Amino acid sequence: MKALVLGCGEMAQPAITDLMQQGMFRGVTVATRHPLRAEATIATLAGLSSQPAIERIDVHDTAALVALMRRHDVTCNLAGPNYRNAVPVARAAIAAGVPLVDVSDDWEATLEILALHDVAVAAGVTILLGLGASPGVTRGFHGAPHALL
């Protein structure tokens, strides 16, 4: 499988490392508007046996984003700001037919993406939203005590 990571900021660093170290991906691509920043970010990551590919992308260039997504098996959206980028990325994932994991914490973008549910289901696309720190991990902290009862 091949994974696409959109964005190269602070939240992308552990995601890139995890994807590279899991062993289930034969390739990871980091796509960003800032390829030089991506190179600098990747240079700081320890313990990588190989390097991810880097591509320049503007997530608002729908045709280019869909084409890039189609070359991968899953997309992880870490390209902020969420209020501006989450919805176009979700629409592109549906058009590409590629599953999407998104860390968006923006409630308005979340509502817009949830409104795409039927379209995503019809396209056979799974979209996982709010998988950042908060919401995301904090939901697990809330639910964990209840799961133990």
Where in this protein do the model-derived segments appear?
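ADP-ribose/adenylate-binding Rossmann-like module
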Residues: 81, 92-110
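Helix N-cap at the beta1-alpha1 junction of Rossmann-like dinucleotide-binding domains, i.e.
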Residues: 34-37
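Conserved N-terminal Rossmann-fold NAD(P)-binding element of oxidoreductases
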Residues: 3-9
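Short beta-strand element of Class I
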Residues: 27-29
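Rossmann-fold NAD(P)-binding glycine/threonine-rich loop
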Residues: 103-127
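Conserved Rossmann-fold cofactor-binding substructure of NAD(P)-dependent oxidoreductases
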Residues: 55-74, 78-84
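Rossmann-like NAD(P)H-binding beta-loop-alpha module
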Residues: 123, 128-149
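N-terminal Rossmann-fold NAD(P) dinucleotide-binding loop
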Residues: 12-13
